[in-house]
């Protein structure tokens, strides 16, 4: 199929001498270039308490990017699922879709750094992070659709409807970072897209 290019912009801080302000303005400039150059999408991630980047909430970055770009799709690369409650994730994603006028795509992963796990969900390992991701991802469309009650291993809540609802029909496309055959199977069976390149090194995606 057609190879479409995406930019993975992680706001890497190569030197401690770089201020956070400079890091962010460089990020915006890079994204403007990607948009003007006709790239399909810009993906930006979620990290906490790590010196090399400043991206605690990709939705914030994406809403700002929407004001600096015109055509490019804007994706979370990636949401770290186990750090989110499903209702909060569905609502923030839908609000972002609204604010970006329907340009949002959602990449979801279990996360990769024990540094973050230890600080945000103490005691959680990669296996349980994967289980949380597989529980949370399918709830999004159900919450956007509305009147969805959930009784899972990690989350339980009574009938809930996301407020707001996204403006894209059926919600923003959902991508699963498939680092193993399990997540690949999971993505296909839930009608999600598969992000095959490891997100920290990939620059293109195959569609």
Across the structure, where does each feature detected by a protein language model lie?
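Conserved beta-strand positions in the central sheet of alpha/beta enzyme cores
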Residues: 6, 43, 105-107, 195-196
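Conserved N-terminal glycine/acidic-rich loop preference
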Residues: 30-32, 42-44, 83-87, 115-117
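Active-site beta-loop-alpha junctions enriched in small/polar residues
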Residues: 10-12, 47, 79-81, 109-113, ...
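Short hydrophobic alpha-helical runs that function as membrane-insertion/retention elements
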Residues: 73-75, 194-197
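Short, small-residue-enriched loops and turns at beta-alpha junctions
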Residues: 50-53, 81-83, 203-204
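Active-site-adjacent beta->alpha loops and helix N-cap segments on the catalytic face
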Residues: 54-60, 200-207
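N-terminal beta1-alpha1-beta2 module of alpha/beta enzyme domains
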Residues: 1-76, 169-172
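Internal, glycine-rich beta/alpha segment that forms the wall or movable "lid"
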Residues: 2, 85-192, 204
